[in-house]
Amino acid sequence: MSDILQTILARKAEEVAQRRAQRPLEDLQVAVASAPPVRGFVRALQAAVANGDPAVIAEVKKASPSKGVIRPDFRPADIAVSYEFGGASCLSVLTDVDFFQGADAYLQQARDACTLPVLRKDFVIDAYQVYEARVLGADCILLIVAALDDTQLATLSELAMSLGMDVLVEVHDIDELERALQVPAPMIGINNRNLRTFEVSLQTTLDMQKAVPRDRLLVTESGILGPQDVALMRDAGIHSFLVGEAFMRVEEPGEGLRQLFFAA
């Protein structure tokens, strides 16, 4: 298969094997005990929504496979502070090295600079990465349904929750949503970007939202670029957003966030 997701996953399997060779799983399992206390990720989003506000997961992202380098002047700690000041509920930090120019250190720098819960945004395919995320200080991990079989999805989500983390289970179509709902994670992300082609359509969320049970927190991801996009979602009853690129392209990301979501 030549699609982008398969290319990323093949490389990720190699990366996990290399990391495991450098630092055994047993070391990580011991290190979890001294990881920083978990900050409630879902709780922070729910609090914003309950207050009538948009719940924004603001992304700390230097580059992407489709756009190349998005933010050349990339300082994760400064970005995190700016986001918190701008009204973000949570952060999402890219740690994938090969395709997004991310780094584990970026997550630590961002989290240390603010009080917000942080999602480790990566392609999780192995229990090793779940322990790794918690050791780094992550409060939530991403599980992409298109990247996992049902057994992996169940096992990895259960492990993450047993370590105190929240899980954002990401889907792109109805078949993936049906699989995601077999997992008791309280949060479903609908990615408007097709990870096989990287094409974006906000209609993806609008078409699928009614199939998401009310007891799951629905997050719309990708393609939220202007106030009209926010209004479209909020009018449809969707109040949680994951946004990155729109903020990374402005000098003060937090001000970009405030303008997009909170400027009356």
Swiss-Prot record:
Claim: GTP-binding is one of the keywords in the record: no
Top-level EC class as recorded in UniProt: lyase
The keyword Transmembrane is assigned to this record: no
One Pfam family per UniProt: IGPS
Known EC number: 4.1.1.48
GO molecular function: indole-3-glycerol-phosphate synthase activity; phosphoribosylanthranilate isomerase activity
Biological process, per Gene Ontology: L-tryptophan biosynthetic process
Superkingdom classification of source: Bacteria
Record-linked Gene3D superfamilies: Aldolase class I
Pathway: Amino-acid biosynthesis; L-tryptophan biosynthesis; L-tryptophan from chorismate: step 4/5
Keywords of this entry: Amino-acid biosynthesis, Aromatic amino acid biosynthesis, Decarboxylase, Lyase, Tryptophan biosynthesis
Catalyzed reactions per annotation: 1-(2-carboxyphenylamino)-1-deoxy-D-ribulose 5-phosphate + H(+) = (1S,2R)-1-C-(indol-3-yl)glycerol 3-phosphate + CO2 + H2O
Family (UniProt): Belongs to the TrpC family.
Protein name: Indole-3-glycerol phosphate synthase
Organism for this UniProt entry: Stenotrophomonas maltophilia (strain R551-3)
Taxonomic lineage: Bacteria, Pseudomonadati, Pseudomonadota, Gammaproteobacteria, Lysobacterales
